[in-house]
Amino acid sequence: ILPHKATAKVDSRLPPGLDPDEALQKIRAFLDDQGYADIEIRKLGGYPASQTSVESPAVQAAISVFAKYASDINVQPRIAGSAPFYQFTERLGLPLVPTGMGFGTGAHAPNEIMLIEPGDDIAAAGLADIEKAYVDFVYALADAE
């Protein structure tokens, strides 16, 4: 027995420069071209991507500060998650540096964890060092501007 309908929720992470409405139009055009004009699309939300240059004084300040506290610095121009970061970078013209330092897992899950004090076998910062690093970052950012 086949159901009379099927539904799917699709989350698209857009690159900088691609407008959410334009992306939706491209998806609609692709489905139509493939013979799926009968598929209904309901837009539930959306916002533009955001990116701050790795050369930005804010990013360089974060890298220099976090290097004091963590042995492995991983710079990612974009993150896999989504948030309306464009409000800062596009509308306000401010650099945004989404950062994380230390060891954690299970983000946004009931079993999300963060280490208070990592063991010697973990090359990551614990809670106290993370707090110190964020204070140092604010000072480094003030000096960089």
Q: What spans do the regions from the language model cover?
A:
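Short amphipathic alpha-helices in soluble, non-transmembrane regions
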Residues: 23-31
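His/Asp/Glu-rich mid-to-C-terminal helical/loop segments that flank catalytic regions of hydrolases
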Residues: 26, 71-73, 101-145
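Hydrophobic, well-ordered secondary-structure elements that form the walls
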Residues: 10, 62, 88, 115, ...
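Active-site-adjacent substrate-binding region
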Residues: 53-96, 100
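Midchain, well-structured core segments that form catalytic/ion-binding scaffolds
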Residues: 1-18
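Flexible, glycine/charged-enriched surface loops at secondary-structure junctions
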Residues: 36-42, 144-145
